[in-house]
């Protein structure tokens, strides 16, 4: 987590530099962070999130949230990455303007709980109105409920080559997958690869 946090804190200036180098101008840049663990092991501490933050004008708010994150909890694998992905799809994306990019970046070194598990578990903290299974989550990405602007959406994943992550990489459009090693953290992720993937998607 320390490596991810350090990279997150320098993310905006590095991204802006990369955009400038490619003569790309982004008038409005909003970032939302969803930090997740395991609803079935961590209860109310399973998820921490921000609203969308105007990173150009309110970087301090973003940095404060990143500093507050800790690696506590999570239990053993798997974790609730699919729920975090669903929550990101349900976000308040900007819909005005001719040129938009709705980019979701997933950093994970864990496999995922199946969405069906929620139907047989009584977790009061589990988020409302989640997809009941992977097929419904796929429908969300396809624009049947969310992410309806096909030309705007992008999904960049740094996640293990296993279960749902592999299925997403294989079957979802506008998706790039850089495999990480399950259970070994994300220190091996090339930070410049992350920046390049985002800049090239704009």
Where are the language model's segments positioned?
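Extracytoplasmic/secreted cell-surface and envelope-processing proteins
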Residues: 1, 41-45, 97, 112-121, ...
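Von Willebrand factor
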Residues: 1-107, 112
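Extracytoplasmic/secreted envelope proteins and their assembly/folding machinery
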Residues: 5-12, 33, 59, 63, ...
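Loop/turn elements at helix/coil->beta-strand transitions in domains of secreted/extracellular proteins
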Residues: 26-31, 97-103, 148-155
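C-terminal "exit" segments of structured domains
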Residues: 172-202
């Amino acid at each position: 987590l320390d490596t991810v946090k350090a990279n997150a804190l320098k993310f905006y200036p590095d991204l802006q530099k990369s955009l400038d180098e490619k003569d790309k101008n982004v008038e409005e840049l909003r970032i939302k962070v969803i930090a997740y663990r395991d609803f079935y092991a961590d209860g109310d501490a399973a998820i921490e999130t921000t609203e969308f933050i105007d990173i150009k004008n309110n970087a301090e708010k973003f940095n404060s949230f990143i500093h507050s994150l800790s690696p506590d909890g999570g239990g053993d694998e798997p974790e609730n990455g699919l729920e975090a992905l669903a929550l990101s799809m349900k976000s308040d994306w900007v819909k005005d303007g001719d040129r938009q990019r709705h980019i979701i970046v997933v950093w994970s070194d864990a496999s995922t709980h199946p969405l069906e598990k929620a139907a047989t578990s009584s977790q009061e903290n589990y988020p409302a109105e989640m997809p009941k299974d992977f097929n419904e989550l796929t429908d969300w990405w396809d624009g049947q409920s969310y992410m309806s602007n096909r030309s705007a959406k992008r999904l960049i994943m740094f996640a293990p080559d296993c279960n749902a992550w592999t299925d997403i990489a294989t079957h979802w459009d506008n998706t790039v997958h850089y495999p990480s090693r399950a259970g070994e953290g994300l220190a091996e992720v090339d930070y410049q690869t992350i920046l390049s993937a985002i800049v090239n998607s704009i």
